[in-house]
Amino acid sequence: MPSDIEIARAATLKPIAQVAEKLGIPDEALHNYGKHIAKIDHDFIASLEGKPEGKLVLVTAISPTPAGEGKTTTTVGLGDALNRIGKRAVMCLREPSLGPCFGMKGGAAGGGKAQVVPMEQINLHFTGDFHAITSAHSLAAALIDNHIYWANELNIDVRRIHWRRVVDMNDRALRAINQSLGGVANGFPREDGFDITVASEVMAVFCLAKNLADLEERLGRIVIAETRDRKPVTLADVKATGAMTVLLKDALQPNLVQTLEGNPALIHGGPFANIAHGCNSVIATRTGLRLADYTVTEAGFGADLGAEKFIDIKCRQTGLKPSAVVIVATIRALKMHGGVNKKDLQAENLDALEKGFANLERHVNNVRSFGLPVVVGVNHFFQDTDAEHARLKELCRDRLQVEAITCKHWAEGGAGAEALAQAVVKLAEGEQKPLTFAYETETKITDKIKAIATKLYGAADIQIESKAATKLAGFEKDGYGKLPVCMAKTQYSFSTDPTLMGAPSGHLVSVRDVRLSAGAGFVVVICGEIMTMPGLPKVPAADTIRLDANGQIDGLF
């Protein structure tokens, strides 16, 4: 089979206006970025307010492994399949970060015959949204230091500035820096550092805002520092929000592209799935729901992180509710959860599959605990055996009373996911239960953390280190105790130890630190080491990326 980039380049793309027609979007509502990408105008989106909404389908996954699960590929394949069976469907995805493209090979536009295109533009600069977010964040950083330089009327304590700088690149050298060196004219020297743009709270706010007015209000709530008497200082206090909103105005319009089969996809925003909620923008999701019968979206990492945050943060803030949930699993990944080494995955191993099934089992039960109907999409790999697929379907049927459907969208496009699409429609149009949450926001922050750890992770208890406990007490005192929590832990395990695969139970979830994201509207709970500025590998993908004699990019994918 050809590579992803070869498949994408061989595709004949429709003019973006034709793709927009499928959703009833007129030409005048499009801001074109070439022939195959467009932004959807704010005014058109505002005109959709009050329209009935279609069905929302959430795609999540088991705990990820190096063997790969193919969640984005399944999201695209399912969207194509829904269109094939006569449903007007749109996919809502996150934008890829630029930095990782030059670190580890590969993008985030699906794979095989289930891709969104134009692939290279999507994975690189796209429409410049991340540049706008980087600029807005950088403007805030400049205004903070400028305020301190010119008399510091807010009495900001330079030892307690929480606002770091950002760049959309993997660069470990910028994790910790000294700034304002070189003399009095350059300001007050202090320690600082950079995060990657997707870790910025501006990105999280961007993806949770309902409109421009809500965006500006949320930006104003962001706490960027403390005064010398330990009072919070916000972006509104340093008068940054108006100019930041101006920089983000055009970026807040969702981006329209297409799949290889010419179906519409909205790709907008891309917050970290760890220290943020890991979902595409609310504006894109709402737009999709008001224009299509089915909107298929995904949440970052496994269901313990992505789906939980989608429900407890995004759905709680917006009133959204999925009508069906697809949990993506692979035979390969389940065998890894059952103890098989990656190099041995090609050999049939029913015992390891059954042992690793415990991971899928817990994810299914967790999603059901929110009152949501579930189907398992088994992403097919050519090394899989018929016996392994049959055994997995048997386990799902007998132990979970849930349907598991083998999907071949990577090799066959939408045609390979039609059975999954039919199952999703059956669930979405069937009986619906009220959405429930893992915790109530009225409870203390520590109780919310414990609820997630014990109910969803299988933990016996939580342990909050003294630094985190002190900060939590301060958040409660300052009036932030009713916010939801955003868990930041390893994606590879239900525990905080990435080597504990399967479905560990009885462990302790240790909380090392907490951070306030008042603009986004949650408290980040850090369990273990969380890296907000990645580094490049020993041999980065950038080493082999070039333009060939025909002006095409070589080595990116």
Curated annotation (Swiss-Prot):
SUPFAM superfamilies on file: P-loop containing nucleoside triphosphate hydrolases (SSF52540)
Pfam families xrefs: FTHFS
Protein's UniProt name: Formate--tetrahydrofolate ligase
Entry keyword Ligase: yes
Binding-site residues for ATP, renumbered to this chain: T65, P66, A67, G68, E69, G70, K71, T72
Pathway named in the protein's UniProt entry: One-carbon metabolism; tetrahydrofolate interconversion
Catalytic activity: (6S)-5,6,7,8-tetrahydrofolate + formate + ATP = (6R)-10-formyltetrahydrofolate + ADP + phosphate
Recorded name of the encoding gene: fhs
First-level EC class: ligase
GO biological process per UniProt: tetrahydrofolate interconversion
This protein's UniProt keywords: ATP-binding, Ligase, Nucleotide-binding, One-carbon metabolism
Family: Belongs to the formate--tetrahydrofolate ligase family.
EC number: 6.3.4.3
GO molecular function: ATP binding; formate-tetrahydrofolate ligase activity
